[in-house]
Amino acid sequence: MTTTLVSATIFDLSEVLCKGNKMLNYSAPSAGGCLLDRKAVGTPAGGGFPRRHSVTLPSSKFHQNQLLSSLKGEPAPALSSRDSRFRDRSFSEGGERLLPTQKQPGGGQVNSSRYKTELCRPFEENGACKYGDKCQFAHGIHELRSLTRHPKYKTELCRTFHTIGFCPYGPRCHFIHNAEERRALAGARDLSADRPRLQHSFSFAGFPSAAATAAATGLLDSPTSITPPPILSADDLLGSPTLPDGTNNPFAFSSQELASLFAPSMGLPGGGSPTTFLFRPMSESPHMFDSPPSPQDSLSDQEGYLSSSSSSHSGSDSPTLDNSRRLPIFSRLSISDD
């Protein structure tokens, strides 16, 4: 058994070392011959070169260890990560190593403060640009963007231009070269100043609608919102076309009926018109609109006020205050004390 293992190892080593040369004639025992025949599967019948892709090409040391372990019945040593990578034919170390370092081509636009702030000269002259959508200049007025300038941009004269008559910055200079630039800058400032400001009449629910904004503007522009409306009489209101017709409305009253209804309570003569009382200023109204009494004279004033109110409702006398009369409850208390 030992002789068989040693002979198999020797023949395997000689096969690895003599690979690429012509087939050699080995004098070996039957077991070695069987191993050689099993290894040379696919080799031509006559003596010739063996097929190069029929045998793997590992290192000789690893192949010896694997062969000895397989003959002794031991498990084969595990392949390291490096050996497994190189044994894999589909692995490309250079490509895999360079793959993470490659940058993906960015499809976004270049972030520049002057992007699309000037018109593309070839596009304006020829109607076409070789850069297409990737061009950094504006292809038309609709793509032109406004450039954010410094507050002092074009506010002072360019010393270089007005000294030697030439400026290396040209139209991109931040100072004024001629009167046209000054006028253009002034026009741009006027446009920004004339921009309408936001209204401050925003509700909590959000921005007002167009109809509400138009109504508010109409109210502000109308002169009736500044001056009070004129005082109308009852006759004007009754004769207004906006009121319903008296013949069809059962709750409509004529001026004479209104006078007869309100005359007893208002102290008006029976034949008078209620328009003189309903639509006259408050300064000429009865004392029912007087200020409340002071705390010192509250009892007497309350008594007089109540008495005047009762008398006005009864229609017996005019609505005047009577300080001599008291409430019935206070009269009873004074009698019981006596």
Curated annotation (Swiss-Prot):
PTM annotation (Phosphoserine): residues: 54, 90, 92, 203, 318, 334
Known outcome of mutating residue 54 to A: Inhibits MAPKAPK2-mediated ARE-containing mRNA stabilization
Gene Ontology BP, a term: positive regulation of fat cell differentiation
Record field: compositional bias (Low complexity): 296-318
Keywords associated with the record: Cytoplasm, Developmental protein, DNA-binding, Metal-binding, mRNA processing, mRNA transport, Nucleus, Phosphoprotein, Repeat, Ribonucleoprotein, RNA-binding, Transport, Ubl conjugation, Zinc, Zinc-finger
PANTHER family named among the record's database cross-references: CCCH ZINC FINGER/TIS11-RELATED (PTHR12547), MRNA DECAY ACTIVATOR PROTEIN ZFP36L1 (PTHR12547:SF53)
Name used for this protein in its record: mRNA decay activator protein ZFP36L1
